[in-house]
């Protein structure tokens, strides 16, 4: 029996509050990136039936319940969220929820050019674009032969025109795969107002072939960049920010580093994730989720009570104990959880 915590502050077993919700609106993707959804493991026709995904009504109720227990930051993920039909309609509904201070979306950018204006008009405030290479052939290869860098760059340009003037650009760096793209990416985005962030290759899921030797640490990346463009550390924007921020000494913006492997940040993790079919994951490295649909059927208040109970027993800190523990269960794939 889970405790009744309806009147208590929303904290897990380590005193961590819940402030950030990553909400997957679709599990399907038009790319097949090797570290997430490799083509040899995930067929092109993979995906849930539409009626298995949470409806817009369910998603709105779910977000309202999360806001009731403390969430202020909402990020829509996938899969590729721009594949979700009528997404701007959903965004308009979510943007109207009182208490949501930040509404963002993560995309591979291939479909962004045609949707950027509608997303902005609907109330989306920020966009993060995943981009692991600038070189066209390598980009195509890393996306499983599905993506073209020109499409993504066009999407970024369209987002700028629509009023998204400060995008985040995420790059997952893998040794001997795309580490030679780090400096070209920095050179491309310096001075644009966008924030490039380098993410250590993580052991999320079980089909990406992760091994420690493939990780290029943030410290190594920072040293390479600093040797070309001197950097100075910046303070975090808020408690729980995952990226270590550094400013270019010449004033041409900043770059970030997400160091889940080499410098775990579990102690400040304030995030929950919900999959497109309504399962709650309290850690990106989870081996199982919790189906929220029964509680969701009880309405906003019933779900909020359930979330308080679930969060109160959260004790996840996988990245901190990665080296000293072995997984007993197969981890859930990142494209199902929603990175």
Curated annotation (Swiss-Prot):
Binding site for [4Fe-4S] cluster 1: 29, 33, 36
Pfam families: Fer4_12, Mob_synth_C, Radical_SAM
Cofactor: [4Fe-4S] cluster
Binding-site list for S-adenosyl-L-methionine: 35, 79, 130, 202
Pathway(s) it belongs to: Cofactor biosynthesis; molybdopterin biosynthesis
Example GO BP: Mo-molybdopterin cofactor biosynthetic process
Enzyme class: lyase
One GO MF term: cyclic pyranopterin monophosphate synthase activity
Catalytic reactions on record: GTP + AH2 + S-adenosyl-L-methionine = (8S)-3',8-cyclo-7,8-dihydroguanosine 5'-triphosphate + 5'-deoxyadenosine + L-methionine + A + H(+)
Cofactor: binding details: Binds 2 [4Fe-4S] clusters. Binds 1 [4Fe-4S] cluster coordinated with 3 cysteines and an exchangeable S-adenosyl-L-methionine and 1 [4Fe-4S] cluster coordinated with 3 cysteines and the GTP-derived substrate.
Keyword Iron: yes
Oligomer and partners: Monomer and homodimer.
Function as written in the Swiss-Prot or TrEMBL entry: Catalyzes the cyclization of GTP to (8S)-3',8-cyclo-7,8-dihydroguanosine 5'-triphosphate.
Family: Belongs to the radical SAM superfamily. MoaA family.
Protein name stated in the entry: GTP 3',8-cyclase
Gene: moaA
């Amino acid at each position: 029996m889970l405790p009744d915590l309806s009147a208590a502050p929303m904290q897990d077993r380590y005193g961590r509050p819940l402030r950030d919700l990553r909400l997957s609106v679709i599990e399907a993707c038009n790319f097949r990136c090797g570290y997430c959804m490799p083509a040899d493991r995930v067929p092109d026709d993979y995906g849930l039936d539409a009626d298995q995904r949470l409806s817009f009504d369910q998603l709105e109720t779910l977000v309202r319940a999360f806001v009731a227990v403390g969430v202020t930051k909402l990020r829509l993920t996938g899969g590729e969220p721009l594949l979700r039909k009528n997404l701007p309609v959903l965004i308009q509904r979510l943007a109207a929820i009182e208490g949501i201070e930040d509404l963002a979306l993560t995309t591979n950018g291939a479909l962004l050019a045609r949707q950027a204006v509608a997303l902005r008009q609907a109330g989306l405030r920020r966009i993060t674009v995943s981009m692991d290479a600038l070189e066209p052939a390598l980009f195509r290869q890393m996306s499983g032969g599905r993506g073209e860098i020109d499409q993504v760059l066009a999407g970024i340009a369209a987002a700028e025109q629509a009023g998204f003037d400060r995008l985040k650009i995420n790059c997952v760096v893998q040794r001997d795969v795309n580490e030679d793209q780090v400096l070209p990416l920095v050179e491309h985005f310096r001075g644009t107002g966008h924030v490039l962030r380098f993410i250590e290759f993580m052991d999320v899921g079980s089909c990406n072939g992760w091994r420690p030797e493939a990780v290029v640490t943030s410290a190594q990346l920072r040293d390479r960049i600093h040797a070309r463009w001197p950097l100075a550390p910046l303070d975090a924007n808020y408690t729980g920010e995952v990226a270590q921020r550094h400013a270019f000494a010449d004033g041409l913006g900043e770059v970030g580093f997400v160091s889940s492997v080499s410098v775990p940040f579990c102690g400040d993790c304030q995030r929950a994730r919900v999959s497109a079919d309504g399962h709650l994951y309290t850690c990106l490295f989870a081996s199982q989720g919790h189906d929220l649909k029964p509680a969701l059927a009880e309405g906003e208040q019933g779900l909020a009570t359930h979330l308080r109970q679930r969060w109160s027993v959260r004790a996840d800190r996988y990245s901190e104990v990665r080296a000293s523990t072995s997984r007993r269960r197969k981890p859930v794939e990142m494209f199902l959880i929603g990175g």
